[in-house]
């Protein structure tokens, strides 16, 4: 008879042998496939802990906690001296690259071979906020989710500037015009919550006119911050125990559930003949995304997952883009004046979508803001099968690299957008004029590319452009009132830790 201690020792020995055998098999498979596919070796990060890579995890976590995640990435790549390298992240192989060719391959040629569901749904990082939806799933479920939302990001949706006018006026009416300092960032968060809630749910939150509703906007900010922390923690996510975060998640879920319940009830009333309708499927003229969804899905959990997968990531994108543009414009008064001259040249003309798109310098400002302050810092995907990427291997980094099933690839937009090889020696400088003679193609991908490009990319740029147009029309000058440099605090995307403290004078 074996004792309990002997059973325990035997189990430990078996586990070690299994792990070693699995490691040896993976290495054999890796080198065999690497050779067969004509791939070169990738540079290795020099670890102090080669087994789990805890040294790498520690430096990453420290940078994240100190709000140095963006400069840390620049320092990390500079220390490697290459644009593609691999590191050990808690025992898993992680590939880090800032090569545009690799970004292109992951987004187009091999896009089905790279997924995100195991990272967002499988890991539980997005739970309990977002269920299955367009930004959390792969395969047939992604096809279904994409088809549900696609009609709402067509020209009819993003070219309707009239729906923005009332919200933009409310926003700008809250801006002090006596030259006093104010923070534009929280105002824009409230503005976007109001516009997006009407677009997605058919009813605005009205946080700009009813300050008591601001708690939803604040809860959204904290919810997105928590999701980013959980995604970054990866396998250590089980250590994330934040009761305040859960309270904010509940506020957001309750907000969404209330609108789902009301829409499901309204649908039943229409079907039973109790509800009034302007058209067969649009009671009271509803044309919002949720109303279309409830006609295809009546399961509350499924509806919440689908709408949350749009509501959560979109809540950061537009407001932060405008915030960053105003931050940059305040520090470059000549750019602000050039932009204002272009806008004022329109005179009293009606601002249509076509006229908005025709404002060249405004487009340059939007692009330059995307370039220096991309909302999506990196595109992270997990290999769903063995595959390759076109560059990063061999002594000169020009050979393809082998990506093994389960490898996690971090394609870094932030570094790509600030690379002097792509943008010249002034790559770190805010200079909208550069867009008059550059055609960056895959070196500039603020919304990604290929089939999984952000479906709202035209809508985001249109809304941001319209707000900036109205802003420069109304305010003659824009001054910075905070000399501290930009310091990113990470949510889904980065926002300025110090806010956007400025002052304006009216025209």
Swiss-Prot record:
Keywords: Glycoprotein, Heme, Iron, Metal-binding, Monooxygenase, Oxidoreductase, Signal. It is an enzyme of class 1 (oxidoreductase). InterPro entries: Cyt_P450, Cyt_P450_CS, Cyt_P450_E_CYP52_ascomycetes, Cyt_P450_E_CYP52_fungi, Cyt_P450_E_grp-II, Cyt_P450_sf. Its EC number is 1.-.-.-. CDD domains: CYP52. Heme binds at residue 454. The keyword Heme applies. GO terms for molecular function: heme binding; iron ion binding; oxidoreductase activity, acting on paired donors, with incorporation or reduction of molecular oxygen, reduced flavin or flavoprotein as one donor, and incorporation of one atom of oxygen. Pfam families: p450. Glycans are attached at residues 315, 367. This is Cytochrome P450 monooxygenase lepH.
